[in-house]
């Protein structure tokens, strides 16, 4: 750890005027590494994109157990923006993905490649509308407060000279497909000055999804929502044979400026404050309330999709080094954990035992994902069968050519 700190300080002394690195301790270095690895880990394995797509589709459209009364029907939004319903939009987006796998300029492709039916929705006009929505100009990029990170939401650039829409990166296009439904709604609300309404409503929908998962994998007597009291508490209580898990749910996402090679430290600090530091006392209060014979694990459950939680934990040592029973878990981690509980109880018990007896220390933290991986308890476990929306949409896409 000391070597990493010294290398960073040496680089900073030669190349940077940043005061942050001049005074960085090991926790600060991990904070910087969190931003760097967040971006790199996403690029190294795109399997997460299918899971994210299915989860977003399930919460915003697919599940009958999610209360969507506080949000606008997403089909209304896609019709207003593109003249398409959601499934038609997704079919068009799949075609754009395929076209871009052949050529980075999809609008130059012959319409004969994709429009093979008089009643089909995959038309040149539809593709132009969707590509146009996800495009920016050079000027947009230059003036963007988040710089090149704008390509995460707008993965096409429209050239000045030829007015051609060119894909910046296939990885970024795939990422846009994965999270596109969520950001389509969130951006629509923001553009109409209703941004906080969607964020608040989605937080409640995230709770609905947690309860749906609990109903799917657990006995009804194993879990409950902790009643709101004068003393702030965690959100949910879940009991197993060998442990109690307390969950504090956080649907807020890490700012895009924090997810890059030179991360915005202020955005990281804001995310930590809102989603971890302020919520820690709530988990502690509930731990005191439910203290008994069984050991307790305190879980910050994030909707944020990330595979570098061990680095985030190492960057907040006051909590995750000093409190051995505290973890950050992504919603995908929870899906795999609960599926393992139902499918392989012995494997599940080993995971819980390891989490209860962790030996986190400065510079070394084990995440829930790492422990799940150690016991071969990872994979596409939840979004299968009727919940495999990606395959279902893909079949509809194929039908356009039959």
Feature map (PLM): residue ranges:
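Conserved catalytic cores of phosphodiester-cleaving nucleases, focusing on short active-site segments
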Residues: 214, 236-238, 243-251
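Composition- and surface-driven signal marking solvent-exposed, interaction-prone regions
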Residues: 226-228, 233-234, 260-262, 311-316
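Short acidic, S/G/P-rich loop/turn micro-motifs used as interaction or catalytic elements
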Residues: 253-254, 305-309
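Interfaces and regulatory segments of ATP-dependent nucleotide/adenylate/phosphodiester-chemistry enzymes
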Residues: 2-219, 312-402
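Short His-Asn-centered micro-motif
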Residues: 226-227, 301-305
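A short acidic/basic microdomain associated with nuclease active sites
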Residues: 215-239
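Active-site-proximal structural scaffolding
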Residues: 203, 207, 229, 240, ...
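Catalytic cores of nucleic-acid endonucleases
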Residues: 251-301
């Amino acid at each position: 750890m000391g070597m990493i700190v010294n290398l960073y300080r040496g680089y900073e002394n030669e190349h940077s005027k940043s005061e942050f690195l001049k005074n960085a301790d090991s926790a600060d270095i991990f904070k910087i590494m969190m931003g760097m690895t967040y971006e790199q880990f996403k690029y190294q394995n795109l399997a997460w994109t299918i899971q994210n797509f299915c989860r977003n589709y399930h919460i915003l459209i697919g599940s009958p157990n999610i209360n969507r009364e506080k949000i606008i029907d997403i089909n209304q939004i896609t019709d207003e923006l593109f003249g398409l319903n959601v499934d038609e939009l997704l079919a068009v987006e799949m075609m754009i993905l395929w076209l871009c796998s052949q050529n980075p300029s999809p609008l130059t492709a012959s319409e004969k490649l994709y429009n093979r039916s008089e009643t089909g929705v995959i038309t040149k006009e539809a593709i132009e509308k969707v590509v146009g929505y996800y495009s920016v100009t050079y000027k947009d990029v230059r003036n963007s407060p988040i710089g090149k990170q704008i390509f995460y939401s707008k993965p096409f650039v429209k050239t000045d000279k030829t007015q051609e829409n060119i894909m910046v990166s296939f990885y970024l296009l795939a990422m846009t497909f994965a999270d596109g439904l969520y950001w389509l709604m969130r951006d629509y609300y923001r553009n109409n000055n209703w941004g906080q309404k969607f964020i608040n409503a989605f937080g409640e929908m995230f709770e609905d999804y947690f309860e749906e998962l609990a109903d799917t994998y657990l006995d009804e007597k194993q879990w409950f929502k902790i009643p709101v009291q004068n003393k702030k508490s965690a959100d949910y209580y879940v009991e197993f044979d060998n442990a109690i898990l307390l969950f504090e749910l956080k649907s807020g996402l890490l700012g895009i400026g924090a997810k890059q090679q030179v991360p915005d430290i202020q955005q990281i600090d804001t995310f930590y404050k809102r989603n971890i530091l302020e919520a820690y006392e709530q988990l502690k209060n509930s731990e005191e309330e439910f203290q008994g014979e069984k050991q307790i694990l305190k879980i910050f459950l994030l909707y944020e999709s990330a595979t570098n939680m061990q680095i985030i934990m190492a960057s907040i040592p006051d909590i995750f080094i000093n409190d051995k029973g505290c973890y950050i878990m992504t919603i995908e981690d929870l899906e795999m954990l609960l599926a393992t509980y139902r499918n392989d109880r012995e494997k599940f018990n080993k995971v819980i035992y390891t989490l209860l007896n962790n030996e986190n220390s400065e510079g070394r933290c084990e995440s829930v994902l790492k422990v799940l991986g150690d016991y071969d308890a990872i994979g596409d476990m939840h979004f299968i069968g009727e919940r495999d929306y990606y395959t279902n949409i893909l079949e509809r896409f194929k039908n356009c050519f039959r």
